[in-house]
Amino acid sequence: MADDDDYQDMDNDDFVDDNEMEDVIEEEQQRPDHEEEDDDNNVDENFELFDQGKAVPTSEHVTTPFMTKYERARVLGTRALQIAMGAPVMVELEGETDPLEIARKELKQRRVPIIIRRYLPDGSYEDWPTEQLQLADW
């Protein structure tokens, strides 16, 4: 074939010299240690630590007690994955074998052992157990 002939006639100029790669590896190893860690707080300078928000007490929830369609999708997907990986099922099975159907049944009966964390604009967050959230579109 013509492709095979082109391969054998290929100039060696198309390939990178192996010695150039070794130079790059050696340069990375010669970096001083003080560049990788900051002596003040022992944190890599490429990371920025954010202050953790504070939890809003359960009695002072600001957001609505309705589960959004996005939260519902995330809860169902997460719970279905857990069930598929062998997590114990929280409802009586009536012949269901599909993990997603089992997760839907658990959600309808409010037996999903998942807590939804809603972040607020001020950096704080609210934790809502799925049992406390109302499902709108069943």
Swiss-Prot record:
Bias kind Acidic residues: ranges: 1-27, 35-46
Compartment(s) where it occurs, according to its Swiss-Prot or TrEMBL record: Nucleus
PANTHER family reported for this sequence: DNA-DIRECTED RNA POLYMERASE SUBUNIT K, DNA-DIRECTED RNA POLYMERASES I, II, AND III SUBUNIT RPABC2
Coiled coil segments of this chain: none
GO terms assigned for molecular function: DNA binding; DNA-directed RNA polymerase activity
Record carries keyword Transcription: yes
Pfam family, one: RNA_pol_Rpb6
Region described as Disordered: spans on this chain: 1-46
NCBIfam families: PRK01099.1-2, PRK01099.1-3
Origin: domain of life: Eukaryota
Quaternary structure note: Component of the RNA polymerase I (Pol I), RNA polymerase II (Pol II) and RNA polymerase III (Pol III) complexes consisting of at least 13, 12 and 17 subunits, respectively.
UniProt function note: DNA-dependent RNA polymerases catalyze the transcription of DNA into RNA using the four ribonucleoside triphosphates as substrates. Common component of RNA polymerases I, II and III which synthesize ribosomal RNA precursors, mRNA precursors and many functional non-coding RNAs, and small RNAs, such as 5S rRNA and tRNAs, respectively. Pol II is the central component of the basal RNA polymerase II transcription machinery. Pols are composed of mobile elements that move relative to each other.
InterPro entries referenced in this protein's UniProt entry, alphabetically: DNA-dir_RNA_polK_14-18kDa_CS, EF_Hand_1_Ca_BS, Pol_omega/Rpo6/RPB6, RPB6, RPB6/omega-like_sf, Rpo6/Rpb6
Any one cellular-component term (Gene Ontology): RNA polymerase I complex
Family: Belongs to the archaeal Rpo6/eukaryotic RPB6 RNA polymerase subunit family.
A single BP term in Gene Ontology: transcription by RNA polymerase II
Protein name: Probable DNA-directed RNA polymerases I, II, and III subunit RPABC2
Transmembrane parts of this sequence: none
Keyword entries, A-Z: DNA-directed RNA polymerase, Nucleus, Transcription
Gene, per the UniProt record: rpb-6
